[in-house]
Amino acid sequence: MGLNDQEWQQVLTMWGKVESDLAGHGHAVLMRLFKSHPETMDRFDKFRGLKTPDEMRGSEDMKKHGVTVLTLGQILKKKGHHEAELKPLSQTHATKHKVPVKYLEFISEAIMKVIAQKHASNFGADAQEAMKKALELFRNDMASKYKEFGFQG
């Protein structure tokens, strides 16, 4: 399941493009997530009042949270050695927000689609496969941590 050095390099090169506009990418990821899986919006009290795509596009709270979501880059930069970063994240997601692992899959899909849309020429099959593996590693490790906190997610 682990990634080799070349795969990690592909992931981090792509993530550098994401970080060049973290707010824009993060907002696009949340927009795609909520459009594809509207049930996920129930986990976000501050977004429940947003009913239309225009309201979502204009939401400053949603833009800010998009940046927060994409701090995932800090975990990716650890190349799988992310125990210290993952523990507090998994604890809040398991015990406070109660985010099911399935929702982590949904947001991973949204991340992949947004990167593919915004960076099609740089996100070929190899880079996509590497990113998919990195996000899967993240999700699997989150799921393991969830169990440590007694959340089956």
Swiss-Prot record:
GO terms under cellular component: extracellular exosome; sarcoplasm
Compartment(s) of residence: Cytoplasm, Sarcoplasm
Main location: cytoplasm
EC identifiers of the protein: 1.7.-.-, 1.11.1.-
Catalysed reaction equations from the record: Fe(III)-heme b-[protein] + nitric oxide + H2O = Fe(II)-heme b-[protein] + nitrite + 2 H(+); H2O2 + AH2 = A + 2 H2O
Residues annotated as binding O2: H65
Signal peptide region: none
Domain (Globin): residue spans on this chain: 2-147
Protein name: Myoglobin
Gene name of the record: MB
